[in-house]
Amino acid sequence: MLFKKLILIAVVVAGSFGAFAQGPEPVRRQKPVVANPEKKQEVTDPNQAQQPGRQGKGSQIVDDSTKNIYGPKTTLWISENDLFLNKKNYQPLDTNLANYHRWTYVQRFNNFYQDLGNVGTALNPIFPHVSETVGVTTGYSVYDPYFDSEAPVYFDSKSPYTSFRLVWGGDGRAVSRIEYSRNINPRWNFGFNYRPLLVDKQIQRSGKGDRQTISHYYDLYSSYRSKNDRYLLAFNYRRIRHRVNENGGILLTRDTTVNGYYDLNAQPYLLAAQSEEQKNALHVFQQYQLASPFQLYHRLDITKQINRFKDKANSETNYHKYFTFTNNDPDIDTANVSDGMDFKTIVNEVGIKGNAAFLFYSFYYKIRTYSTFNRYVDETLLSFKNDGVENYVGGKIAFQFDTLAELTGHAEYLLDGNYRLQAELKTPWLDAKGMSILAKPGFLPLAYRGSHNSWVNDFSSVFTNQLEAYLKVKWGRLFISPGARYVVLKDYIFYKENKVAGEQAVLPVQSSGNQQAFSPELRMSLRFFRHFYVRPQIIYTSLLKNDDDALRIPEWFGNTQLAYENMLFKGNMQAQIGFDLHWRSSYTALGYDPAIQQYYVQNGFVSDDYPLVDFFFNGQFKRGRFFFKYHNIMQAVTGKGYLITPGYRGQPSIMDFGFDLILFD
């Protein structure tokens, strides 16, 4: 039976591949603002779940009364962080219907990212993002959310578990996802995810299958416990190959006003350019309990990342119009462009950890080796090496006051002087977090050489302080959460437009001053007329200091949802019907340079304010969910769209449909 179902799923996938693409993952692992933030999710220990009786053949999924005994409540998962903290915080599958229609990456993360107007394109956070990596990095990050947004978790599935998701977006925008997990025995589980992402062009699409984004992600994971529970092993391997056919934005010809971006005959700048990122990551976590309050643990991470920009000059009609600078050095191939960087790391972390009453502690030593390669960069001319070894010491501590209140802290010190300090408090009425980090610059802003860019810099480490706190008050049908976020940056590294004629268009810059951003925020949820909800989120940002004009943040930023939520058809279907509204004030948004895969500060274009309104219908029946969504109602009414990134128009009005199914056999 299992084999037949997997074959059926494979046939469906193969038959639909022309429209398939991949976007966000299921609600189980998303971290947007939830519909009912005052509601606490149930915590379940797999040891408390009744074990099924052994059967002569196959798995027993029904009892003698044909009642299902396996389902979302018996298929449990746990994160590695909870395993590390010795928490038996197993969670049932989350089949929550709230916001199921938010399937694109930008909307999944509550519009806190900008992209290039299509699913799978380069992403950049609207608000300053604090990296948690102290040591050297590649400097490439615009495709990180497609890989990092869902780390593998580990299951106790009782019965085989299969999840299948498909979204058909208009004009070849779609999502597909398959996950399978099963227990080999009560102590050993394995599973996999597969997420192809195939998205058609939204500008001058020649027909179905004329792709802009081609991406394939998969992961394999397994967890094992010894019979006496002293030894634990968790393993996962992840891989992605993410390719985007870059169009360079819209080339204005007949109509050079803003309306020209929405012309049906609008042409792209680039025809043959492509960005690519490949990433492989092997992760192993294991621990052994010597005594009740004392454990030894080890982590191993092996990663490889390849970033490339490719182009064929003879295939471009606007090559020199778009790329105002081309490197004339004879060793650089500017006709068949293949620029970029390779980066490899191996990390070994060993330490001790344990529990004493309500206290958790850990201390560790970590060694990290790294190497990078750019075929056009001569390492002998640099003031630093392209490979090296980093040594860290650190520790974590957590106070679990009760099941709802916890205080955690983390300190990590790189022996060359860089560091990270972090503390977080979670209570039923207050969430607060603080972080201070001094981090090495990435390799890309330090040294790069390619067809359209070349530089060598001696940048220092970047200092960041971040504080945030949010109150949580529930008063009858009203939930309110006022709070604020304060960020301080010093020696901040960013990319900036270069207006000097004959020189490269974008250059990395290290600010000589500092930046300070203060962002008070208000989140609310109000229920009225029994089944109606309104959920606003409003953020005001004041740049208290912005040396070198390095930060570009809209002054006002808002998300609002108005929804009707109820059981329909005599209680056979749960429904959520309503409108999503996103709005932000006009500001000089960051531009994008595909040759180096970086967003940069520019002053020549203002992204106007625009109310982005979606209508959605989410439904749930038994073990399946579905949605209908009409995106960007305002453009259908006014005929005017929006520009989320200078030169790149946002998604026009369009209809999307999606569904998922979960099987237990």
Task: Indicate where each model-derived feature is located.
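Outer-membrane beta-barrel proteins
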Residues: 65-66, 73-77, 81, 167-169, ...
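Flexible loop and strand-edge segments within Gram-negative outer membrane beta-barrel domains
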Residues: 205, 221, 228-284, 305-317, ...
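Bacterial Sec-dependent N-terminal signal peptides
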Residues: 1-29, 231, 294, 434, ...
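Low-complexity, highly charged intrinsically disordered N-terminal segments
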Residues: 94-149, 156
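Exposed, low-structure sequence patches enriched in small/polar residues
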Residues: 157-159, 276-314, 334-665
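Sec-dependent signal peptide cleavage junction
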Residues: 19-98
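Transmembrane beta-barrel wall of Gram-negative outer-membrane proteins
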Residues: 174-196, 209-243
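Short strand-turn segments of transmembrane beta-barrel domains in outer membranes
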Residues: 135-137, 149-154, 158-179
